[in-house]
């Protein structure tokens, strides 16, 4: 008697359990450049050299106003010193697109730039309008460097527990040689 009632209650409860499925994920690739140590110093020196000769961009993307950026002033896709790294990044983007079975014609149009962050420099959350895929490559950083945060593109006015990855912000440590690839 009691055992049958418990089974019946359990079955009824199990039949009514809510199933939550996750759709429209944000796919973020996270990989490390296998030759980062070979190019790191040369590219860091090159970036600092550029920062001394090319004025920082006046573009007003949101930051504290101190951030040095070559956005719109120096396209590193056209800079020969970045060629090896750019080619590796293009290969990684192709893998990302192929893995996600995206039907997109990769022309690698657009631009690439670098930012030099000092203590207290930051950027606000932003989108890359007009782009399909974006990348972030960390040339230099340390354990005190800021993390990169991603938040859902879906407007949500309900605060969630940040320990619940599908609903909270997601972040990545900035580590030398790390490449993040994501939908713009």
Segment roles from a protein language model:
Residues 1-17:
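N-terminal amphipathic/basic-hydrophobic helices that include classical n-h-c signal peptides
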Residues 3, 13, 61-62, 113, ...:
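Intrinsically disordered, low-complexity peptide-like regions
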Residues 13, 17-102:
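Non-heme Fe(II)/2-oxoglutarate
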Residues 22-25, 106-108, 176:
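A short, polar/charged loop/turn motif at coil->beta-strand junctions and beta-hairpin connectors
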Residues 87-91, 95, 99-119, 125:
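Extracellular-facing segments of soluble proteins and assemblies that are Gly/Ser/Thr-biased and enriched
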Residues 110-181:
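Catalytic core of non-heme Fe(II) oxygenases with the double-stranded beta-helix
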